[in-house]
């Protein structure tokens, strides 16, 4: 047996027993070791340079997601979800540095194709390439932070990263509008090239991290789960297609919506069967034993629901501002600032609390409860509601969702060994990305269905403008204000009623998320970094670049395992 084959056998044996030898911890109290505040890790300049490059790359990717006109098919942009597990597998085989540089280069290539597009087909293909690159960036920045920072302290840096991501998300529409008004639409894409180019240079110069080089290229290629990735991409694409066009371009009952839905979920079933077969799939792209841990499973679900509820707010508060209050898109964006500002602030606060206390379950329970109450209370908003009411509600929603976004990854990884960081981060990113498209499609379906029920109140001469998914498309102040006063009041009343249904249904989604936190256990967050992909060591420095404080726990034995 060759050395590579021996290594492969050892790796496979190392991963399988994880979920069966779990040490059960009290779910209601933190382990005693967490009560002691660990020594603060000191990070060298090389770490901060690498972290700065990651933040800039994350900012550009986030800005791309909000700068581009929503008229482009969202299925293209959301295709990135399907490739994130593959990026995780590639990062384990070829190291984080090269895969991160590759993802950034793919993103820039897609931006260049879009900017130079001379047809809609070329633009759509460019967006597909750009989205695949963005998906890798979004997953890899979190993964690399996990490689460079002990688990106990990751919340601090993930929260800081989300500050940059939120800057990109918030500034995107403003920059996009300014570029479109003063130059050409092509600069909406070209602007990524100088900024992304600078980020790429920083990554090449400062992202100097270790990686395993003992395998040959041939052995690495054998470890790529080609079949599993292909099935997952196909199944994800089918579901995204149905969610994107169902209720808008086609009725939900149409065969060309039902068929992709069925094929997508059948595909996911086949994917699960493939990944669980050790003979066919010795190196799964998404190890299913991660879901044997009830804490990891609950945290994956909370991550998915967090993004659903976040996009629920991001897409339907503007509908309220424009169709009910009569705000312009610009003013609507300003009115969304309480959420957009509170979200990253509390992402940093939530991450900091986990780092300080070593506990994530209480934060998840409180945060999900706050979100459920605040998003449900949005159902009382009307044309005459004082602006302080919707501003405060947004702040509370941002408080809850922000606290969740920066703390669920630690809960996922607490019961897993460090060797599975890439796979668990990729699965976490995949769940979050899926949540974004469900977070638009589900409330849109509820909204349009309710508006169809209310269409009988409208004058027959205008009714066709609001049925079969058109109510959401026409939710603009310009359109609503175009009617005479009496008709306008009826239309505004219908929008208010449809939005009320959207917010009331959101309570059920929030309540399920609250209940899911009860399945989490409070596992110890490791305070010592033990990664094979940390900062590259300097010559003569066996300890590497990161200076560690005294009294840190050894994590080389892998993650804690909990009895399910």
Swiss-Prot record:
It comes from the Eukaryota. PROSITE patterns: MFS. GO terms for molecular function: transmembrane transporter activity. Residues 1-37, 540-564 are annotated as: Disordered. It is a multi-pass membrane protein. SUPFAM superfamilies: MFS general substrate transporter. One of its GO terms (cellular component) is plasma membrane. Gene3D superfamilies: MFS general substrate transporter like domains. The keyword Cell membrane applies. Belongs to the major facilitator superfamily. Residues 21-35 have a biased composition (Polar residues). MFS-type efflux transporter; part of the gene cluster that mediates the biosynthesis of the cytotoxic leucine-containing cytochalasans, including aspochalasin C, aspochalasin E, TMC-169, flavichalasine F, aspergillin PZ, aspochalasin M and flavichalasine G. FfsH might be involved in the excretion of cytochalasans. Keywords: Cell membrane, Glycoprotein, Membrane, Transmembrane, Transmembrane helix, Transport. This is MFS-type efflux transporter ffsH. It is found in: Cell membrane. InterPro entries: MFS (IPR011701), MFS_dom (IPR020846), MFS_trans_sf (IPR036259). The chain crosses the membrane at residues 43-63, 98-118, 131-151, 157-177, 187-207, 226-246, 254-274, 300-320, 334-354, 362-382, 389-409, 427-447, 502-522. It comes from Aspergillus flavipes. Residues 1-18 have a biased composition (Basic and acidic residues). Its main location: membrane.
């Amino acid at each position: 047996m060759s050395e590579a084959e021996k290594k492969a056998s050892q790796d496979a044996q190392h991963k399988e027993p994880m979920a069966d030898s779990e040490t059960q911890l009290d779910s209601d109290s933190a382990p005693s070791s967490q009560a002691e505040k660990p020594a603060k890790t000191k990070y060298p300049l090389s770490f901060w340079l690498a972290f700065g490059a990651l933040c800039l790359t994350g900012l550009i990717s986030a800005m791309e997601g909000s700068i581009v006109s929503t008229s482009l098919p969202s299925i293209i942009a959301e295709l990135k979800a399907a490739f994130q597990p593959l990026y995780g597998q590639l990062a384990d085989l070829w190291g984080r540095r090269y895969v991160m540089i590759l993802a950034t280069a793919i993103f820039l290539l897609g931006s260049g194709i879009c900017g130079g597009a001379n047809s809609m087909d070329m633009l759509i293909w460019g967006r597909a390439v750009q989205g695949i690159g963005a998906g890798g960036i979004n997953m890899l920045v979190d993964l690399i932070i996990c490689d460079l920072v002990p688990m106990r302290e990751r919340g601090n840096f993930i929260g800081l990263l989300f500050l940059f991501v939120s800057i990109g998300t918030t500034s995107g529409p403003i920059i996009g509008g300014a570029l479109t008004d003063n130059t050409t639409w092509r600069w909406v894409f070209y602007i990524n090239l100088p900024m992304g180019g600078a980020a790429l240079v920083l990554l090449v110069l400062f992202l100097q991290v270790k990686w395993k080089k003992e395998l040959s290229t041939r052995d690495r290629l054998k470890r790529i789960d080609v079949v599993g990735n292909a099935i997952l991409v196909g199944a994800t694409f089918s579901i995204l297609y149905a969610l994107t066009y169902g209720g808008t371009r086609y009725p939900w009952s149409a065969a060309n919506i039902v068929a992709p839905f069925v094929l997508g979920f059948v595909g996911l079933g086949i994917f699960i069967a493939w990944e669980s077969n050790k003979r066919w799939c010795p190196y799964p792209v998404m190890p299913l034993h991660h879901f044997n841990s009830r804490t990891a499973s609950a945290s994956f679900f909370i991550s998915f629901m967090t993004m659903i509820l976040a996009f629920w707010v991001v897409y339907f508060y503007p509908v309220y501002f424009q169709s009910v209050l009569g705000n312009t898109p610009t003013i609507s964006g300003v009115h969304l600032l309480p959420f957009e500002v509170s979200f990253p602030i509390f992402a940093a606060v939530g991450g900091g609390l986990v780092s300080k206390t070593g506990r994530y379950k209480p934060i998840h329970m409180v945060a999900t409860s706050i979100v459920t109450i605040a998003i449900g209370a949005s159902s009382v908003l009307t044309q005459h509601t004082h602006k302080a009411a919707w501003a405060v509600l947004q702040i509370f929603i941002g408080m809850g969702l922000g606290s969740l976004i920066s703390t669920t990854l630690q809960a996922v990884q607490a019961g897993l060994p460090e060797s599975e960081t890439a796979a668990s981060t990729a699965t976490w990113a995949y769940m979050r990305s899926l949540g974004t498209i469900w977070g638009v499609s589900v409330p849109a379906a509820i909204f349009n269905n309710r508006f169809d029920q209310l269409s009988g109140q409208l004058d027959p001469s205008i009714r066709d403008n609001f049925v079969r998914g058109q109510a959401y498309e026409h939710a603009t102040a310009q359109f609503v204000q175009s009617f005479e006063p009496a008709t306008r009041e009826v239309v505004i009343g219908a929008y208010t009623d449809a939005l009320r249904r959207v917010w009331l249904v959101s309570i059920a989604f929030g309540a399920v998320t609250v209940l899911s936190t009860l399945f989490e256990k409070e596992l110890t967050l490791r305070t010592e970094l033990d990664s094979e992909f940390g900062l590259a060591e300097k010559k003569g420095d066996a300890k590497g670049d990161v200076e560690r404080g005294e009294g840190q726990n050894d994590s080389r034995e892998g993650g804690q395992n909990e009895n399910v």
